[in-house]
Curated annotation (Swiss-Prot):
InterPro entries: Ribosomal_bL33, Ribosomal_bL33_CS, Ribosomal_bL33_sf, Ribosomal_zn-bd. Signal peptide: none annotated. Gene3D superfamilies: Ribosomal protein L33. One of its GO terms (cellular component) is cytosolic large ribosomal subunit. It holds the Pfam family Ribosomal_L33. This is Large ribosomal subunit protein bL33. PROSITE patterns: RIBOSOMAL_L33 (PS00582). The lineage of its organism: Bacteria, Pseudomonadati, Pseudomonadota, Gammaproteobacteria, Enterobacterales. GO terms for biological process: translation. GO terms for molecular function: structural constituent of ribosome. Belongs to the bacterial ribosomal protein bL33 family. Keywords: Ribonucleoprotein, Ribosomal protein.
């Protein structure tokens, strides 16, 4: 089977709470770092989540 181009990434909260989401991203079409505004349940607000590598 062929290996897919989608890579697993972690979206880390910029609020500094340590909360994160995991998702996949196509590295070929979106080489830049992903930034999304998502809900952080620790601070109970929508904050910016930035892409980080899964270790």
């Amino acid at each position: 089977m062929a290996k897919g181009v989608r890579e697993k990434i972690k979206l880390v909260s910029s609020a500094g709470t340590g909360h994160f989401y995991t998702t996949t991203k196509n590295k070929r079409t979106k080489p830049e770092k992903l930034e999304l505004k998502k809900f952080d349940p620790v601070v109970r607000q929508h904050v910016i989540y930035k892409e980080a590598k899964i270790k």
